[in-house]
């Protein structure tokens, strides 16, 4: 039997070898087609195939035997791979469940689970109550003795250990240590006083009254708005057409700015805007022309929809809301107007946000040409943040021309009058006054980058520039890109850090010091509870591109990123988000760090004005949810940290590589605890930890870049 079996095997191998040598392409294609229909042909079918293809009966028989064997081996291999993947997922889920059981919290109070922990926490609260009562009695006795009046009884005071006062912050605005940056506590008093809840300001920050309650516009006000809109459209169009007579070159950086003499001669007579003294305010004007990868009609729609507008400019627009939608104007061309509130912020907590109430008008000039004009308008009972500069947007706008192949030519004009209530920080003063802060170049650079990103996002297959790695589906690719975009938006939002606490002992000539803020998060997409954020800005004598490449260099990342714990990092997936392959979103995999394994999602970009590198650690379970593409990425909780890189706009800066100086802002966030359980000790330890993280990261990065 063995010899017959061996003879049969050798015979089969010989025939298979002959098949490979002698079967023509036509014969193989016909056999493959028949195999897909009937993998087990009977004797008559084999003879029929042999006659048709001029093959022997044994050749047909052994070909089908070999083909069935190949198919069985392939299926078994695919099943084994699928089982391994499923087994890995189950192991990761088990590890995540074990980790969750180790850190389980009590649902009613958010505290540690277990009777002993509850008793310990209760004892701490009782001890604290005794201390507070003693302090109250001392202060009450002192005031009664020296001031002639007393304080209400302790029983009349609100329960300091009841529901969290952080829950009262509106719209998730930061509730911060200390007061605003203009009235900082002195260093000595800060070091002497205990780091308790009394140092935390949880009062909701002032919002424009109009956004909380506003009335419908009267017909008289609407008519006035229509007239303002008509004048704004005419002025913006004139500024574009009068390029040679109305625009001059800046003596500082050579960019195009409006000639103030000609502008005053032509336009200010009929303006509804009030001019301020030149000693109190300054004008910022600029114009840029770019071509973007987006259809003109889609672009117009995104400009008129405030939600899409905020998404199109995630690193500039922090808030946007449509207040009034006005009826179409009585005009031969299609025209739409609306009143919009927007808050803008860029680069660093040292840069104050700007707020506007804008009348935005869109008018179709030709079949393939649209003009969108913005101009500030005055509404009653509007109050902005107390420290924000007074900003008036003089007629500005965008001319959008449709081009072939789904592209658009965009001419952007930005013209703003700014009255600063607080002198800008010296690190960013030249950049803001030079026009690179909120100028047209920043808007157009962001527009180009986002249009390219949206174009790549909508692709139905992996482009050759991508490295999918662990991401196997196009849905997973889109999920990762969407998560990276939301991470950039969230990180840009926290940069406002309104009402922050400066630590002056950390400050230096080229360093802003460390600023800390605390907020209670209740929004989806971020961990619910208390979050501490610390940030710092500094100047580096290096071009922005060099700093950007350093922060993305995986070979040295473990030397400054605490999430790596000193272990090397590898790239698990990479998706390019623009024509420059340096702009990408990546999944990074640190080497095994004890029992807790994680992945890091990172999104970064670089353009003519600077860039960002933003990242967030994820446990493997959350990372697999993002990679699978089966989960809505907006529901995946992320807490981003990262860096904002900006060119220094100082007149002495070189244009090579975006300038010879870089302004770098870094910010780290720490999740303290859930929404219903925290102590002063938690806040103190977390603030100290995040302050140490920022300070040590600054020192390490400066040392590695030889900038000490």
UniProtKB/Swiss-Prot annotation:
Q: Which residues cross the membrane?
A: none
Which InterPro entries does this chain map to? GLABRA2/ANL2/PDF2/ATML1-like, HD, Homeodomain-like_sf, START-like_dom_sf, START_lipid-bd_dom
Instruction: List, in alphabetical order, the Gene Ontology terms for molecular function in this entry.
Output: DNA binding; DNA-binding transcription factor activity; lipid binding
Q: Which residue intervals are annotated with compositional bias (Polar residues) in the record?
A: 165-188
Q: Which Gene3D superfamilies does the entry link to?
A: 3.30.530.20, Homeodomain-like
**Ranges for region Disordered:** 1-24, 162-188
Write the record's keywords in alphabetical order, separated by commas: Coiled coil, DNA-binding, Homeobox, Nucleus, Transcription, Transcription regulation
Q: What does this protein do?
A: Probable transcription factor.
| Similarity comment: family membership | Belongs to the HD-ZIP homeobox family. Class IV subfamily.
Instruction: Give the multimer and partner information.
Output: Interacts with ANT, BBM and AIL1.
State the name under which the record lists this protein: Homeobox-leucine zipper protein HDG10
| Species of the source | Arabidopsis thaliana (Mouse-ear cress)
Gene coding for it:
HDG10
